[in-house]
């Protein structure tokens, strides 16, 4: 592929940037993807997984599986099966279950792929592994990747994922969906709208004033007087806000010890004031913006503006 240290450095960077588990099989699959084009560094995991599947099915040792079995057919068939898993809230399955779901689907779609061979390829490459007498995807991101492909193929399933499963708040699904072709303006428009709505909702619930700036008086050489002014300003703004009394009590406690059991209170606060939802929506939107290379410039600009607005609200 290239000089040894260069390949190792590239492998390490990709594992970190793509948030993929550092396991031998993942390292091997990335190295296989490098064979496709080492100079082309993918910016999203959708491209990585597509490269991996393409090399797996283009492997000369796999040709006996038949000419119709390739990464496109794999995504088409396994995407449908992952729809079944998500609708049933299942993580594991049997071989018979896989055949029972996929064979009628292939017949209906006039797809001649051999699903027995397909499953064997997935098992041979440890995309699907055995556990307690059943099968499951080795890593959950494979389910989300194939589900994203299915969302492209089925408007009905896409509507189900976005409405019933609230997939806008699942960054991995949005990342894979937008990363498949870089043209998902429909999702980007939804993210723009939801970011604006949720940011305003969080702002209204928390009730902190727009002009709060606890850092205004902070300097590199902070004296005790200015420090006290800054702390008092922050505490006063919190007292006048709409956050819960429990949070106000914690802030008011001068001897607060971070190891004391206030974690549940903070978690309840994040839930009650939609902070967690906003955090996940920011993640989804950021990944969508990164992956959406071919949407209209005005949509990119508006999404970036709303991400910044939501981030400001989160930091408040």
Task: Give, region by region, the residue ranges found by the protein language model.
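Extended hydrophobic
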Residues: 1-153, 163-168
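Extended amphipathic alpha-helical scaffold segments
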Residues: 150, 155-316
């Amino acid at each position: 592929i290239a000089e040894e240290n260069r390949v190792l450095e590239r492998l390490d960077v990709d594992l970190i940037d793509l948030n993929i588990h550092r396991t031998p099989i993942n390292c091997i699959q990335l190295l296989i993807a490098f064979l496709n084009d080492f100079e082309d560094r993918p910016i999203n995991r959708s491209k990585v997984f597509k490269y991996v599947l393409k090399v797996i099915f283009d492997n000369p040792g796999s040709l006996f599986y038949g000419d119709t079995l390739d990464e496109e057919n794999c995504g088409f068939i396994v995407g449908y099966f992952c729809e079944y898993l998500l609708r049933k809230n299942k993580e594991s399955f049997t071989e018979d279950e896989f055949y029972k779901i996929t064979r009628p689907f292939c017949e209906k779609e006039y797809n001649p792929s051999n699903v027995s061979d397909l499953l064997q390829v997935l098992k041979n490459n440890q995309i699907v592994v055995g556990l307690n007498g059943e099968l499951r995807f080795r890593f959950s991101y494979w389910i989300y990747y194939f589900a994203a492909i299915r969302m492209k193929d089925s408007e009905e399933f896409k509507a189900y994922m976005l409405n019933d499963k609230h997939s806008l708040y699942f960054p991995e699904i949005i990342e894979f969906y937008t990363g498949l072709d870089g043209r998902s303006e429909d999702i980007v428009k939804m993210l723009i709208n939801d970011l604006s709505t949720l940011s305003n909702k969080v702002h209204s619930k928390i009730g902190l004033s727009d002009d709060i700036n606890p850092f205004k008086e902070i300097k590199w050489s902070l004296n005790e007087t200015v420090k006290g002014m800054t702390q008092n300003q922050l505490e006063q703004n919190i007292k006048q806000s709409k956050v819960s009394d429990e949070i106000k009590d914690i802030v008011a406690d001068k001897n607060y010890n971070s190891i004391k059991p206030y974690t549940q209170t903070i978690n309840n606060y994040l839930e009650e004031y939609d902070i967690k939802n906003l955090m996940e929506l920011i993640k989804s939107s950021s990944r969508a913006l990164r992956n959406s290379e071919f949407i209209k410039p005005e949509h990119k600009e508006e999404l970036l503006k709303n991400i910044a607005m939501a981030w400001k609200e989160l930091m408040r």
